[in-house]
């Protein structure tokens, strides 16, 4: 078990001792990250088995209605996924063809609503199709580390990508922040090798993925250490099970814990917050910003 963090503790990122100069971001990312509060990404799962809302939005009319609700609630972008990647297992892998069958009836209509859409998929074929349909961002839960095809595609399309930390299984013996940093170094190496521009990359510590519940808390507590990469940070702690480790609850009962985690992330440098509960998160972030402005 890892001990408490010292105030001076920093993640080592290879030979880098200081943050690299901030790159000129891709225009889509620049627009999202130029707001007075973190951008809010609304989650839309067109799956039967996602951990907190599986099956609710599988029908095309339900998915479109939910996308409209998320935007009305203040979502700055929509993250749509057609394969559950639920933390702690239990999801059934699906083929690229199945993902496409779930996405084809709805993606173009959601893109037409006028906010950027990210496609939550680890399959390059699915992402390629989604980009053709107007999706703006790829969200890869394996951080470009399931072969070079994804990175090469995104480089060719000049498309932004969310690079998420992940592990096949949690290991309570490791320093999770060192593991996250090393993972991101490998992802950035893949990007450089395939020509994917650094300014197209957002880093996500992957709360709940390949981590013990304590490690998810540590990743949130020490999120600011990842600013050493000089890249935007995204955090998605919405309804994750680490909340229940602090306050026992079912996924639908974790709104308070989700907001607490996201406010902590915002104070530590997160520029994008991924959530199921958009209206409440937008309100919380605005109030936090108003309080901080009075200091």
Regions found by a protein language model. Give the residues of each.
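Catalytic domains of carbohydrate-active enzymes, especially glycoside hydrolases
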Residues: 65-81
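Active-site-adjacent loop and "lid" segments of alpha/beta metabolic enzymes
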Residues: 12-28, 35, 52-69, 85-116, ...
